[in-house]
Amino acid sequence: MSFKQYLVEEVTRGLDETYKVDEAWAEDYPGKKYFDVHLSTIRDHEMATPTFRQYLGQGGMKILESGCGSGRWMAFFEQLGNRAYGVDDSWGPIRLAHRHDPDMNLVRATVLQTPYADNTFDAAFSSYVAEHFEEGPEALFREIHRVLKPNGLFFVVVPFNNAFRRFVVNPILMALWRLWKWRGRGLGFTEFRYTQAEMEGFLRRTDFEIVEVKPDDFFAPWQKGLFCDLCDLGCFVGYEPKPPYEFGPFGRAVAAAIRGLGPWVAAGGIFLVTRARK
């Protein structure tokens, strides 16, 4: 079953400031060089990249990214010869993207009610967005289904409730939450971490056909799932990790021990390729 993730309220409020940090970092990369930095990460480290090349590499497709952030995946899809459109409900990432590429097709809107007609897109992508709806992801999936053409592709990534989380991270987090509540500190909901069965159920109920399912993470030696888990634990003790995904001695030891057990054991996300049934 899924795991409902909470963080200290000060941390959840701080998540709203993420793009201020990103904007400050982006000052070092004027113009489209900002996207070049992100594209190198996608090209060299993201497990999802070969799958996107397989399905979208022929180009000529109209693609929606739902919850696009600052548009790094949009830039990648366009590099493959497609036309990308993005929706996000925050001005911060949209301003950041437009500052570096004014021609990007970005609009500010809720991902649950996008400003597009039925059957508009050949494909859609949602990366680490669906988990943030406390009522579940089905409303998001229904909206994406609406704007996709018949048999349109939908790629979706959400945090995965993997074995390392179920048996190690989650019990520690629950103990820390009890401690913080006892100390009178508030906790705020941040996300669900879903199982494969749950995600397949959500998607089938919203008229998507499952094509394939894969782990989502970075290729070794980077492991964004494990890095995020150590960050979640560290926020309770004042630990501030240093980007990009650099482990300390303890993190490197844990990563090395887990790596030989296969990609699913500590995968940060679950990546599903689906088609809209219409």
Where do the PLM segments sit?
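A C-terminal cap/extension of S-adenosyl-L-methionine-dependent methyltransferases
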Residues: 169, 173, 201, 211-278
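Conserved class I S-adenosyl-L-methionine
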Residues: 155-178
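Acceptor-substrate binding/catalytic loop of class I
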Residues: 181-198
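Conserved N-terminal segment of class I S-adenosyl-L-methionine
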Residues: 1-116, 123-127, 141, 267-270
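Residues lining the SAM
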Residues: 127-130, 157
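A short glycine-rich, Lys/Arg-flanked "PGG" loop and its adjoining helix->strand segment in the class I
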Residues: 138-150
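A short hydrophobic/small-residue beta-strand
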Residues: 84, 154-155
